[in-house]
Curated annotation (Swiss-Prot):
It comes from the Bacteria. HAMAP family: Ribosomal_uS13 (MF_01315). Located at the top of the head of the 30S subunit, it contacts several helices of the 16S rRNA. In the 70S ribosome it contacts the 23S rRNA (bridge B1a) and protein L5 of the 50S subunit (bridge B1b), connecting the 2 subunits; these bridges are implicated in subunit movement. Contacts the tRNAs in the A and P-sites. GO terms for molecular function: rRNA binding; structural constituent of ribosome; tRNA binding. This is Small ribosomal subunit protein uS13. Residues 93-121 are annotated as: Disordered. Keywords: Ribonucleoprotein, Ribosomal protein, RNA-binding, rRNA-binding, tRNA-binding. GO terms for biological process: translation. Pfam families: Ribosomal_S13. PANTHER family: 30S RIBOSOMAL PROTEIN S13/40S RIBOSOMAL PROTEIN S18, SMALL RIBOSOMAL SUBUNIT PROTEIN US13M.
Length: 121
């Protein structure tokens, strides 16, 4: 397995797919990186030379990926919470942030149902 940005990427997959194992690199970014490095997307990771791997590493080092990106995202959320914005309040309460309906759905964000017992009459 080759290590790129601290992540072991699978050897048997195509390079363009393997690069998406790095947090912050999707298909589009992977394609752009390979184009800049001059590597074919269809190449398998095991077939890459050390020189090609080095080029890919250098390009990815310029991008914000893995730990740096995770830290930035968490700091952005923390900042929203601290300034008391609507989005920050939604984050704090664990509710959907982008205006989705919460009457029926939003189970992923709210977690498992907590049923409330009825009052006795």
């Amino acid at each position: 397995m080759a290590r790129i940005a601290g992540v072991d990427i699978p050897r048997d997959k195509r390079v363009v797919i393997s690069l998406t194992y790095v947090f912050g690199i999707g298909r589009t970014t992977a394609q752009q990186v390979l184009k800049e490095a001059g590597v074919s997307e269809d190449t398998r990771v095991r077939d890459l030379t050390e020189d090609e791997l080095g080029k890919i590493r250098d390009i990815i080092d310029k991008l914000k990926v893995e730990g740096d990106l995770r830290r930035e995202v968490s700091l952005n959320i923390k900042r929203l919470i601290e300034i008391g914005s609507y989005r920050g309040i939604r984050h704090r309460r664990g509710l959907p942030v982008r205006g989705q309906n919460t009457k029926n759905n939003a189970r992923t964000r709210k977690g498992p149902r907590r049923t409330v017992a009825n009052k006795k009459k």
